[in-house]
Amino acid sequence: MSKNYHIAVLPGDGIGPEVMTQALKVLNAVRNRFAMRITTSHYDVGGAAIDNHGQPLPPATVEGCEQADAVLFGSVGGPKWEHLPPDQQPERGALLPLRKRFKLFSNLRPAKLYQGLEAFCPLRADIAANGFDILCVRELTGGIYFGQPKGREGSGQYEKAFDTEVYHRFEIERIARIAFESARKRRHKVTSIDKANVLQSSILWREIVNEIATEYPDVELAHMYIDNATMQLIKDPSQFDVLLCSNLFGDILSDECAMITGSMGMLPSASLNEQGFGLYEPAGGSAPDIAGKNIANPIAQILSLALLLRYSLDADDAACAIERAINRALEEGIRTGDLARGAAAVSTDEMGDIIARYVAEGV
């Protein structure tokens, strides 16, 4: 008998609800094809929760997430709520507390250039022609964003500001294992990013990554300085499989990886804790300017579902089925407006229907 799974669904604001609808169509196709027992419950979050409950992250939403095996998150935010104090706005008041509550220490951001979308890549045509499929694994809870001491002091010419880059052994060990385990499901290569020629924290990072690598003899390990990595991503992104990054370096490189794909509407992300519980969401924003027009690209949300199946439900076959369905749709020239460039475009609903059908048919 298959295991019972439960997913907390948080559609959010802007295009969130309409792209989430498409992901749930695909989930239904997965359930039927793979005989998976998956239930869902919907909860308000972000601006929708402010409107309905007076706060961006109501207790009922937190409780619903606690009872789930994973969270499928849409997007939050919009001009309607920008007048609120920063900690009460949808982004800071919902997403950051969820990450803290569930101790989500690792962020996974795939960046793939799909066949047929090379023209959207801002790199030279000969580089784009090689394609790329990169997974950026970023540590989320340590490093310079959280290290102490930090602050400002002094005045006049002696005024100064300071931050502290701090990493503990356990933080490096656990994010390194995420990267190596991910590489085992991909092309068996990890490139660890640091600045070990200057920073003590990076020296420790490199030492510990080397130690963890001995547990994965089937995975190739390379080290690269952050400044060189930013250049190599532009020069030849196809050389990379899994990028292992600290919080700061991952923040930079994951956005660079996203940019060279040419479309934020294609980029999912996952944030995981040590127990495998995860929050899965598109990398783009709520796009309130196109909300409700049935023109948003739902692929990032659907790919976020694929990540959920792979990392939290250990259903790699189902995740691969979704990815193959998306590949087929794109190979056939099926595009939403953001990718059409003057050609005929399908609606949000139509793209969801097509991908769900391809999953059901086992393309």
Curated annotation (Swiss-Prot):
The record's free-text note on cofactor binding: Binds 1 Mg(2+) or Mn(2+) ion per subunit.
Positions bound to Mg(2+): 227, 251, 255
InterPro entries on file: IsoCit/isopropylmalate_DH_CS, IsoPropMal-DH-like_dom, Isopropylmalate_DH
Family annotation (SUPFAM superfamilies): Isocitrate/Isopropylmalate dehydrogenase-like (SSF53659)
Positions annotated to bind substrate: 99, 109, 138, 227
PROSITE patterns: IDH_IMDH
Quaternary state and interactors: Homodimer.
Name listed for the protein in its UniProt record: 3-isopropylmalate dehydrogenase
Source species: Shigella sonnei (strain Ss046)
